[in-house]
């Protein structure tokens, strides 16, 4: 399964890593997603949720 938050849609982003000489290398920044149990349509379900969504209270654990 992809590293994607089902609440906020946060996922892996790509970009350049720059050295002091400004050489560029491609790299990825991965979202901090955790597998948690939440209520989905009245039933508990395990889904991937970002840590930011958990901290801000957008979802509540079961």
UniProtKB/Swiss-Prot annotation:
GO terms for cellular component: ribonucleoprotein complex; ribosome. One of its GO terms (biological process) is translation. The keyword Ribosomal protein applies. Pfam families: Ribosomal_L28. It comes from the Bacteria. Residues 9-26 have a biased composition (Polar residues). Residues 1-27 are annotated as: Disordered. InterPro entries: Bacterial_rp_bL28 (IPR050096), Ribosomal_bL28 (IPR026569), Ribosomal_bL28/bL31-like_sf (IPR034704), Ribosomal_bL28_bact-type (IPR001383), Ribosomal_bL28_sf (IPR037147). SUPFAM superfamilies: L28p-like (SSF143800). Keywords: Ribonucleoprotein, Ribosomal protein. GO terms for molecular function: structural constituent of ribosome. PANTHER family: 50S RIBOSOMAL PROTEIN L28, LARGE RIBOSOMAL SUBUNIT PROTEIN BL28A. Belongs to the bacterial ribosomal protein bL28 family. This is Large ribosomal subunit protein bL28. It comes from Oceanobacillus iheyensis (strain DSM 14371 / CIP 107618 / JCM 11309 / KCTC 3954 / HTE831).
